Amino acid sequence: MNKANSFNKEELIACGHGKLFGPNSPRLPVDNMLMIDRIITINDNGGEFGKGEIVAELDINPDLWFFGCHFISDPVMPGCLGLDAMWQLVGFYLGWEGAEGKGRALGVGEVKFTGQVLPGAKKVTYKLNIKRTIHRKLVMGIADAILEVDGRQIYSATDLKVGVFSDTSTF
């Protein structure tokens, strides 16, 4: 198992193909749905709750796919993509911890948007504080997170929940 504390884009793509933590580990999406370019830090003892943290980044440029369709003459990154990136990172954390199975977002307590990501921005930073992980019959991670654009916080989410399942056919 890879217990590195940072990951580059190639490693994140490898995770999407089941080649980073193993073929049975939770996977990140690939191509356009991978909303992360790098994980700057990941650990299991830091953060606001002392149970782990992740700091990750996405480079922004005007050529990103969503700016061309959301919206015409008013391009903005969809807020749901930033929220999905937070869920992606909780699932990645569970795989990094050694969980096996397929990751699925299970919910979120509260989400607030107080700004937007526009084509002229340079960088989105995700900061997650792990609140709890459960490794029993159910494997689940719970985290609070914020999204910053060029250093300014514009999204927050509490109680992001991701589960890891051995069988999702009846989910």
UniProtKB/Swiss-Prot annotation:
One of its GO terms (biological process) is unsaturated fatty acid biosynthetic process. Pathway: Lipid metabolism; fatty acid biosynthesis. SUPFAM superfamilies: Thioesterase/thiol ester dehydrase-isomerase. It is found in: Cytoplasm. It catalyses: a (3R)-hydroxyacyl-[ACP] = a (2E)-enoyl-[ACP] + H2O; (3R)-hydroxydecanoyl-[ACP] = (2E)-decenoyl-[ACP] + H2O; (2E)-decenoyl-[ACP] = (3Z)-decenoyl-[ACP]. GO terms for molecular function: (3R)-hydroxyacyl-[acyl-carrier-protein] dehydratase activity; trans-2-decenoyl-acyl-carrier-protein isomerase activity. The keyword Lipid metabolism applies. Keywords: Cytoplasm, Fatty acid biosynthesis, Fatty acid metabolism, Isomerase, Lipid biosynthesis, Lipid metabolism, Lyase. The active site is at 70. Belongs to the thioester dehydratase family. FabA subfamily. Necessary for the introduction of cis unsaturation into fatty acids. Catalyzes the dehydration of (3R)-3-hydroxydecanoyl-ACP to E-(2)-decenoyl-ACP and then its isomerization to Z-(3)-decenoyl-ACP. Can catalyze the dehydratase reaction for beta-hydroxyacyl-ACPs with saturated chain lengths up to 16:0, being most active on intermediate chain length. Homodimer. This is 3-hydroxydecanoyl-[acyl-carrier-protein] dehydratase. It comes from Shewanella sp. (strain MR-4).
